Amino acid sequence: MILYEYPFNERIRTLLRLEDLFERFAFFLAQEDPREHHVALTTLFEIAEVTGRADLKSDLMKELERQRQTLAPFRGNPGIEQNALEAVLGEIEQTLANLAQMQGKTGQHLVDNEWLASIRSRAVIPGGTCKFDLPSYYAWQQWPAEQRRQDIAKWVLPMLPLRDAAAIVLRLARESGQASKVMAMQGSYQQMLSGRTYQLMQVRVAPELRVIPEASANKYMLWVRFTMQDGDVRPRAVDIDVPFHLTLCNL
């Protein structure tokens, strides 16, 4: 099944973007070629843009504290797996401590590094990081892969508490959902929400159907409309019945 996720609010939208960026960053950092490390570095700059939002850290701390207060009363409850509970609470408490230790504006260390700042300013220009534009960057790219990797890992280190916090919030949100099998009649599905607040919607569809869900929602109703991509033409709505799994997640 192919999984599509749709955020219901701006906070979850930001966390999903952050998750995607960190996954891309980790993939390219693990590679050996300097061109792949270039992608890791430019992705690091994107991460800095997202994490530089003034309220992101405080939002994550508030959400983690809320989750801690929700879960802590279950300690000693015989109906709850205590080892799993303690693992989650320990992870939350450690991440809260790491967030509290973060000083200043997130990503400021990249701004203060004049060499990285020069690369960052050129990276937004198409072809702007050629060897004749940034010979010092080209020289760095010729260093051994492990040395480049250590440098990039050092530069991302101050932002890792935000990655960990986002991962916990998204995991708890995803685990809160219960999947149900539904049918989009003639490619369209809608469901009343009865005023309930959700954080995230997941749509799982069989890959052989080759359909693409497009979703929207408000506090009263959600809509899922399936389309199909054919060649160079924009995705068009389908008029066939489409079975899929729908999960609504709410922290």
Swiss-Prot record:
InterPro entries: ZapD, ZapD_C, ZapD_sf
Coiled coil: none
UniProt main location, coarse: cytoplasm
Cited Gene3D superfamilies: YacF-like (1.10.3900.10), YacF-like domains (2.60.440.10)
Entry's localization field: Cytoplasm
GO biological process: division septum assembly; FtsZ-dependent cytokinesis
Key words of the record: Cell cycle, Cell division, Cytoplasm, Septation
SUPFAM superfamilies given in the database record: YacF-like
Lineage top rank: taxon: Bacteria
Gene Ontology CC entries for this record: cell division site; cytoplasm
Annotated Pfam families: ZapD (PF07072)
Oligomer and partners: Interacts with FtsZ.
Functional description taken from the UniProt entry: Cell division factor that enhances FtsZ-ring assembly. Directly interacts with FtsZ and promotes bundling of FtsZ protofilaments, with a reduction in FtsZ GTPase activity.
Family (UniProt): Belongs to the ZapD family.
Protein name, per record: Cell division protein ZapD
Gene this protein is translated from: zapD
